Design a protein with these regions (language model features):
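Non-catalytic N-terminal regions of enzymes
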Residues: 2-184
Length: 185
């Protein structure tokens, strides 16, 4: 029995060896430590459309945009002394909303991701753990997701500042710790 556990652990480590990991930035370090069932550290951004959301198209839009946000395709891990973000090969799922907003992230339900995409009737919502991004990053992600969703529905979506393209390579500033750059003495 013990050798089976060791072999399974070894296989998991070998499988994860190719995955990248990212440090939590200074602003995010506090959130994994303070998250409880009473303090979720989750925020929500929503958009209401003119017609009901098509779940299949929303899922396809999510699959198309997640590649542009590699730092969102991560799970929170505990290291020896600190938490870190590890890349995952999993694909996030858009789900129908049926629970209270801004609930604590649940590894089983959310696939380990630190965000979730929800829909209900005409509304698309994205909930993020503060350890992953701030409000600005959340708005940029939602705008990009909405633009792709509308494009897949055959609607000509607006383009311009703040609307990203799936072909765009992420800018290095998107990964950086702004606190360390601008505030650290």
């Amino acid at each position: 029995m013990m050798f089976g556990i060791i072999n399974a652990t070894k296989e998991r480590l070998m499988r994860n060896r190719h995955l990248k990991w990212y440090r939590l930035d200074n602003a995010a370090k506090i959130f994994p430590s303070v998250m409880t069932s009473r303090m979720s550290a989750v925020f929500r951004i929503s958009a209401t459309l003119k017609s009901c959301v098509d779940a299949g198209i929303l899922q396809k839009a999510l699959e198309n945009v997640i590649g542009r946000f590699p730092y969102y395709r991560v799970t929170l891990r505990s290291g020896l002394f600190w938490h870190y973000l590890q890349e995952t090969d999993s694909v996030p799922r858009a789900r129908e909303e049926f629970f209270d907003p801004c609930r604590k992230m649940n590894r089983r339900e959310d696939g380990g991701f630190l965000f979730r995409v929800l829909y209900y009737r005409r509304k698309i919502s994205v909930e993020f753990c503060h350890a992953l991004t701030d409000g600005t990053g959340g708005v940029i992600f939602l705008k990009f997701l909405l633009a792709e969703y509308l494009r897949l529905r055959g609607v000509t979506a607006a383009s311009g500042p703040g609307i990203l393209s799936p072909e765009e390579i992420p800018d290095g500033e998107e990964f950086e710790d702004a606190y360390a750059r601008y505030y650290k003495q």
